[in-house]
């Protein structure tokens, strides 16, 4: 095999990281806009809570579209290669984000505004569905022996980078132009400016060599005509296990970002059931707190990769999942009648745990599948988990809080942690798996 097919570590890091950075940049600017802007710009109801729920429901649309993207891009990623497929997913994902920044609002085109917003959100979701699996494979299939989880943190580090850049952009726009300008028109700036990240990502990925693991499988004639169907017929068990291993991670991330922001900035009033609907913390204050916690997120992703290579993915994640459950049950201590200080403590602790659970996933999920279905299998597990862990949370977390308080949301997180814990118990350690042999 020619040595030109090997990629240097810096290129692997950038190629895998940039797409995930765009993914989470897209996710968070959309989540922030759904809370701050879309509820008034794209939806027209006399009930503010209804507008909030409709706006956050569009956030959930992408999670439903992700498995479609997983099947589509997974099929081509396992048939024609990781590189070409990653380029296509990046164009769809990034292009949809830019178009959102150009959409007219409800006052300009009426009901077509939320319809077009939903179409773009579905486009984002389909592109996102093919992004992470390919990025994880670029990292792990190019990793040296014994460092697969460490290399797997490259795409995962894109998450705090995207989170930081997205929040930083919103913070600067709001600070420099004011909140009124942000709500009226300046919210478009982060969406349109994402074209710069897409351009960087395309440049790096177009200069990348195909994974040597995929090339070896291709030379051995291991390519399949319908890899997605093979995942469901021959590799259903690892896909189900992988899906539930990822569920708690998604739930935690959604609650740490979208729910925490919506709850923190909502005026401090009571629901009909007598529970607090919010804390009344200014949006810029919360954004500043989240910026700092995003740095903590990144630090603990790197730590998790080191320990997942040292002690194993399964053992590491079992302990971290227990911590997620404990955090869920402790949520009222931080958020009920909370202050900026207690919210900050919640964000820092939660993002540290988030880094520890998210970090090893780019190594673990691909290790569950053989090369000929690895893109499809890892992508499907990752994105099916988003429906259970994030989509449902997006649709019901505010209602749970209104009916049962913060404790209800915390119990929901703990239940998701329990599902992940049981999936980990049902799994096997994959640290020493040879990706060219399975």
Curated annotation (Swiss-Prot):
<feature type="topological domain" description="Periplasmic">
    <location>
        <begin position="107"/>
        <end position="115"/>
    </location>
</feature>
<feature type="topological domain" description="Periplasmic">
    <location>
        <begin position="399"/>
        <end position="405"/>
    </location>
</feature>
<keyword id="KW-1003">Cell membrane</keyword>
<feature type="topological domain" description="Cytoplasmic">
    <location>
        <begin position="203"/>
        <end position="239"/>
    </location>
</feature>
<dbReference type="GO" id="GO:0005886">
    <property type="term" value="C:plasma membrane"/>
</dbReference>
<feature type="transmembrane region" description="Helical; Name=8">
    <location>
        <begin position="287"/>
        <end position="307"/>
    </location>
</feature>
<dbReference type="InterPro" id="IPR005829">
    <property type="entry name" value="Sugar_transporter_CS"/>
</dbReference>
<feature type="transmembrane region" description="Helical; Name=4">
    <location>
        <begin position="116"/>
        <end position="136"/>
    </location>
</feature>
<keyword id="KW-0812">Transmembrane</keyword>
<feature type="topological domain" description="Periplasmic">
    <location>
        <begin position="178"/>
        <end position="181"/>
    </location>
</feature>
<keyword id="KW-1133">Transmembrane helix</keyword>
<dbReference type="InterPro" id="IPR036259">
    <property type="entry name" value="MFS_trans_sf"/>
</dbReference>
<feature type="topological domain" description="Cytoplasmic">
    <location>
        <begin position="1"/>
        <end position="17"/>
    </location>
</feature>
<feature type="topological domain" description="Periplasmic">
    <location>
        <begin position="261"/>
        <end position="286"/>
    </location>
</feature>
<feature type="transmembrane region" description="Helical; Name=11">
    <location>
        <begin position="378"/>
        <end position="398"/>
    </location>
</feature>
<protein>
    <recommendedName>
        <fullName>Putative metabolite transport protein HI_0281</fullName>
    </recommendedName>
</protein>
<comment type="similarity">
    <text>Belongs to the major facilitator superfamily. Sugar transporter (TC 2.A.1.1) family.</text>
</comment>
<feature type="topological domain" description="Periplasmic">
    <location>
        <begin position="337"/>
        <end position="342"/>
    </location>
</feature>
<keyword id="KW-0997">Cell inner membrane</keyword>
<dbReference type="InterPro" id="IPR020846">
    <property type="entry name" value="MFS_dom"/>
</dbReference>
<feature type="topological domain" description="Cytoplasmic">
    <location>
        <begin position="74"/>
        <end position="85"/>
    </location>
</feature>
<dbReference type="Pfam" id="PF07690">
    <property type="entry name" value="MFS_1"/>
</dbReference>
<dbReference type="GO" id="GO:0022857">
    <property type="term" value="F:transmembrane transporter activity"/>
</dbReference>
<feature type="transmembrane region" description="Helical; Name=5">
    <location>
        <begin position="157"/>
        <end position="177"/>
    </location>
</feature>
<feature type="transmembrane region" description="Helical; Name=1">
    <location>
        <begin position="18"/>
        <end position="38"/>
    </location>
</feature>
<feature type="transmembrane region" description="Helical; Name=6">
    <location>
        <begin position="182"/>
        <end position="202"/>
    </location>
</feature>
<feature type="transmembrane region" description="Helical; Name=9">
    <location>
        <begin position="315"/>
        <end position="336"/>
    </location>
</feature>
<feature type="transmembrane region" description="Helical; Name=10">
    <location>
        <begin position="343"/>
        <end position="363"/>
    </location>
</feature>
<feature type="transmembrane region" description="Helical; Name=3">
    <location>
        <begin position="86"/>
        <end position="106"/>
    </location>
</feature>
<feature type="topological domain" description="Cytoplasmic">
    <location>
        <begin position="308"/>
        <end position="314"/>
    </location>
</feature>
<dbReference type="InterPro" id="IPR004736">
    <property type="entry name" value="MHS_symport"/>
</dbReference>
<feature type="transmembrane region" description="Helical; Name=7">
    <location>
        <begin position="240"/>
        <end position="260"/>
    </location>
</feature>
<feature type="topological domain" description="Periplasmic">
    <location>
        <begin position="39"/>
        <end position="52"/>
    </location>
</feature>
<feature type="topological domain" description="Cytoplasmic">
    <location>
        <begin position="427"/>
        <end position="438"/>
    </location>
</feature>
<feature type="topological domain" description="Cytoplasmic">
    <location>
        <begin position="137"/>
        <end position="156"/>
    </location>
</feature>
<feature type="transmembrane region" description="Helical; Name=2">
    <location>
        <begin position="53"/>
        <end position="73"/>
    </location>
</feature>
<dbReference type="InterPro" id="IPR011701">
    <property type="entry name" value="MFS"/>
</dbReference>
<feature type="topological domain" description="Cytoplasmic">
    <location>
        <begin position="364"/>
        <end position="377"/>
    </location>
</feature>
<keyword id="KW-0472">Membrane</keyword>
<keyword id="KW-0813">Transport</keyword>
<feature type="transmembrane region" description="Helical; Name=12">
    <location>
        <begin position="406"/>
        <end position="426"/>
    </location>
</feature>
